Swiss-Prot record:
This is Protein translocase subunit SecA. Gene3D superfamilies: Helical scaffold and wing domains of SecA, P-loop containing nucleotide triphosphate hydrolases, SecA, preprotein cross-linking domain. InterPro entries: Helicase_ATP-bd, Helicase_C-like, P-loop_NTPase, SEC_C_motif, SecA, SecA_CS, SecA_DEAD, SecA_motor_DEAD. Zn(2+) binds at residues 882, 884, 893-894. May bind 1 zinc ion per subunit. Monomer and homodimer. Part of the essential Sec protein translocation apparatus which comprises SecA, SecYEG and auxiliary proteins SecDF-YajC and YidC. Part of the Sec protein translocase complex. Interacts with the SecYEG preprotein conducting channel. Has a central role in coupling the hydrolysis of ATP to the transfer of proteins into and across the cell membrane, serving as an ATP-driven molecular motor driving the stepwise translocation of polypeptide chains across the membrane. It comes from Syntrophotalea carbinolica (strain DSM 2380 / NBRC 103641 / GraBd1) (Pelobacter carbinolicus).
Length: 896
């Protein structure tokens, strides 16, 4: 209450922050008339002037008013678009490294040009990050015209570019692209064999469009680069055949009065926990699986892989639904993005889940992949020196943005007052009643000429509704993952008179719905294929400008765009995004959600008391329910899910921070090796450490030389350095561990100098680099697999009254130290065994690594497996001597 009184007197923090920016807005406005008089060359020359002033010590903050005024003037000249005052405020918020919450239709894309231009002046590179390739290409071309007009270079990173094109795009002042491409390029760079092959520059400043989608919705999905593993696909088919024979059971909870605790009993062969999204075998189920597969004990350590396959197959059948979680298209299982409803070609679920779904659907099973490099978006974006973002809905997640990314959210006022009317939820008892009511509402509003955007949460629901409308003769468009090709066109025309558009989730984000329709797109569609396209386009444009202007008046009279949600999402933010499609730039509009007690949100997270009250109210079929208690139950259910998902994301980053530290160490070492300047010193230090370890192990400080482990010392020394220890001409009384250490070091140093003389210093340096990189990469790959196994079982430590997170940190650190030890051991063994070879043999070793193409993957999804490398030279067998001349088998050397 006290806080409310203070807010009324002094205004909220957001209002006070906005007030502080008003003088800057006025300053920018005062420069407008002066800049209007400048010629094209003079305006573009301002960029050179600003860069000169920066070089002389000026700060970006001091240049902000002039830079923003220059961008505003360029926008007027190039695009015919003038930045509103609220857009200038949005640009300032982005420059300060904060999140600007701006409602749909307020021109977020144009806002980004202000902060991007200002922060591009130091020439360190600005990344503008969007959610898909279409928006990245569109914005790079559309908004890039402003930047190019002012003398800046603009690049665009989309799927399918080669390394040369990517490097050119990253070298530009401003680079547009998707979050996936930026993240994968970072991982790929850290697998390169030359610094010249790196495509990215150091990460300086990023503006993330739809920041909530990328930093929150996608945060639980790590980026993964993977290569093929050696697992067989046959086991997936074998296990898949038995899953349909299992019967789904229930969890029955009862109260044990003697101990005062809840007791759970399980029926059937497996049970499903929809809240946790897990499926588990019951005791009867385990016995049945053992009988069907012909194994004695499914939980025997020897059957651990089989158990994993059974669990994944059970999950594929019980939890993953066709046309909801995935679609089958052209003989492939394609994931559907749960937040946008878009298909995600190339992405695959990890841990064999994707293969289990492929077996379930009877399509070809792609080989399972092994992780070679991975990072979460959370840790990737935290590497930027400065990070900012834009979205229409961030305030509900302000705490998470602050805690995880240290980003504050500022709500930017709309240019015109919001005129949308958000009506109360209408709740029905069953899905059937709900959809019948939805159809009646659509028919009534369609007859009145009001455009309607219907939001569904799955492809299945959108097609059910489409079928019902077709039967009633209502013309409509369906926009879901199956019909995504026409997305921009369908969304752009969703504001036409009487238009009915059914869209899964937030498909179409980034394209404004213009009341009356978009004359440009209509004209382009009509003139396509004409004999004289330019003349046809001009003629069609005049026609459709008149048509759309008239339709806009009719639509405004009918009440503007009507948003009809058919189910609440787990997150209030996603619901707000759907509502936000109506009421852009002060236009009228309305929104309403139709719900049923069979909706997943209420069924899984809603209180059982809701259904009880429904029965007591005796509501007749087809009648909606409006009850304060039920509305409150919906709000509570959403808050529960949001809190649950926040905990998962927080939990994920705490675990990933451990890997992040290790990843930074490995990637920093790779960069040092690629620099190559300190390589001889690095190898000398590694060799000294190894000799010290041997002496410390077999020549204890307080024991007599005759008690030393001479046989083991000789064996270990030979294993490492490919030579026996030289005889030591020293009386036994003078022999100490220190004397032994110096003797062995001198012997190894002498042999190393001989090797360098054999190879010549340049070849030796090159060889050291290749050996180190090759060994680091192979060991890091194995380490990632070990960490995956550690993660899988770490939760069980809780049963031993141990903190799983602390145990994970400790064991991950031990695994890391073991990996570093193996790297040292392997590179030294190879260096002392490698035979004198021609310089081109060493080059060939490096070329073989370069040619090894790795498939890109995303867990949440992994992409398809890497194709075999096409070799120019004769293929080497795994057990043949390695052609590099090390003396080792190929599989133990370059074939790792």
């Amino acid at each position: 209450m006290f806080e409310n009184i203070l807010t009324k007197i002094f205004g909220s923090k957001n209002e006070r922050d906005l007030k502080r920016l008003q003088p800057l807005v006025a300053h920018i406005g005062s420069l407008e008339s002066e800049l209007e008089t400048l010629s094209e060359e003079q305006l573009a020359g301002k960029t050179v002037e600003f860069r000169q002033r920066l070089a002389e010590g000026a700060s970006l903050d001091s240049l902000l008013p002039e830079a923003f005024a220059v961008v505003r003037e360029a926008g007027k000249r190039v695009l015919g678009m003038r930045h509103f005052d609220v857009q200038l405020i949005g640009g300032m918020v982005l420059h300060k490294g904060k999140i600007a919450e701006m409602k749909t239709g307020e021109g977020k894309t144009l806002v980004a040009t202000l902060a991007a231009y200002l922060n591009a002046l130091p020439a360190k590179g600005v990344h503008v990050i969007t959610v898909n390739d279409y928006l990245a290409s569109r914005d790079a071309e559309w908004m890039g015209r402003i930047h190019r007009y002012l003398g800046l270079t603009v690049g665009c990173i989309v799927h399918g570019l080669d390394d040369r094109q990517r490097k050119e795009a990253y070298a530009c002042d401003i680079t547009y692209g998707t979050n996936n491409e930026f993240g994968f390029d970072y991982l790929r760079d850290n697998m390169k064999f030359s610094l010249d092959d790196y495509v990215q520059r150091p990460l300086s400043y990023a503006i993330v469009d739809e920041v909530d989608s990328i930093l929150i919705d996608e945060a639980r999905t790590p980026l993964i680069i993977s290569g093929p593993s050696e697992s067989s696909s046959e086991l997936y088919y074998s296990v898949n055949r038995i899953i349909p024979m299992l019967e789904k059971g229930e969890t029955i909870e009862s109260r044990d009065g003697r101990v005062g605790q809840t007791v759970r009993e399980y029926t059937g062969d497996f049970t499903i926990d929809e809240k946790a999204k897990t499926a588990s075998l019951t005791e009867d189920g385990v016995a049945k699986v053992e009988r069907l597969l012909g194994v004695e004990n499914l939980y025997d350590p020897g059957n651990i892989e089989l158990l994993h396959h059974v669990n994944q197959a059970l999950k594929a059948h019980a939890l993953f639904k066709r046309d909801v979680d995935y679609v089958v298209k052209d003989g492939e299982v394609m994931i559907v993005d749960e937040f946008t409803g878009r298909l995600m070609p190339g992405r695959r679920w990890s841990d064999g889940l994707h293969q289990a779904v492929e077996a379930k659907e009877g399509v070809k099973i792609e080989s399972e992949n092994q992780t070679l490099a991975t990072i979460t978006f959370q840790n990737y974006f935290r590497m930027y020196d400065k990070l900012a973002g834009m979205t229409g809905t961030a305030d509900t997640e302000a705490t998470e943005f602050n805690q995880i990314y240290s980003l504050d959210v500022m709500v930017i006022p709309t240019n015109r007052p919001l005129a949308r009317k958000d009506e109360g939820d209408v709740i029905y008892k069953t899905n059937r009643e709900k959809f019948l009511a939805v159809v009646e509402d659509i028919i009534e509003r369609h007859a009145g000429g009001q455009p309607i955007l219907v939001g569904t949460i799955s492809i299945e629901n959108s097609e059910v509704l489409s079928s019902m409308l077709r039967k009633r003769g209502v013309p409509h468009n369906v926009l879901n993952a199956k019909h995504h090709e026409r997305e921009a066109e369908i969304v752009a025309q969703a504001g036409r008179k009487g238009a009915v558009t059914i869209a899964t989730n937030m498909a179409g984000r980034g394209t404004d719905i213009i009341l009356g329709g978009n004359p440009d797109l209509l004209a382009q569609r009509e003139s396509a294929g004409a004999e004289n396209p330019e003349a046809a386009l001009a003629q069609a444009l005049v026609k459709y400008q008149e048509v759309c202007a008239q339709e806009k008046q009719d639509v405004l009279a009918a009440g503007g765009l009507y948003i009809l949600g058919t189910e609440r999402h787990e997150s209030r933010r996603i619901d707000n995004q759907l509502r936000g499609r109506a009421g852009r730039q002060g236009d009228p509009g309305a929104s309403r959600f139709y719900l049923s007690l069979e909706d997943d949100l209420l069924r899984i997270f809603g209180s059982h008391r809701v259904a009880y009250i429904m029965d007591r109210l005796k509501i007749p079929e087809g009648e909606p329910i409006e009850h304060r208690f039920i509305s409150k139950a919906i709000a509570n259910a959403q808050k529960k899910v949001e809190a649950h998902n926040f905990d998962i994301r927080k939990h994920l980053i705490e675990y990933d921070d451990v890997m992040n530290t290790q990843r930074n160490v490995i990637y920093a070492q790779r960069r040092e090796v690629l620099g190559g300047e300190q390589l001889p010193e690095t190898f000398a230090a590694i060799i000294d450490e190894m000799v010290e370890d041997i002496v410390a192990t077999f020549c204890p400080e307080k024991s007599a030389p005759e008690d030393w482990g001479w046989a083991s010392l000789n064996e270990d020394f030979f294993s490492q350095f490919n030579m026996p220890p030289a005889p030591l001409e020293v009386p036994a009384s003078d022999l100490t561990p220190t004397v032994m250490l110096e003797h062995l070091k001198q012997q190894v140093d002498a042999r190393l100098q001989e090797r360098e003389a054999e190879f010549t210093p340049p070849v030796m340096l090159h060889l050291m680099k290749v050996l180190l990189l090759q060994t680091i990469d192979a060991q890091w790959k194995d380490h990632l697999l070990s960490i995956d196994h550690l993660k899988e079982g770490i939760g069980l430590r809780g049963y031993a009254q141990r903190n799983p997170k602390e145990e994970y940190k400790r064991e991950a650190y031990e695994l890391f130290l073991q990996m570093m030890g193996r790297i040292r051991q392997e590179v030294v063994q190879k260096l002392f065994r490698i035979q004198l070879a021609k310089e081109q043999d060493v080059e060939r070793m490096e070329q073989r690594q370069r040619r090894h193409r790795i498939s890109l993957n995303r867990a949440g999804g992994e992409a398809e497996a890497a194709k075999p490398v096409v070799r120019d030279e004769k293929k080497v067998g795994r057990n043949d001597p390695c052609p590099c001349g090390s003396g080792l088998k190929y599989k133990k050397c370059c074939g790792q």
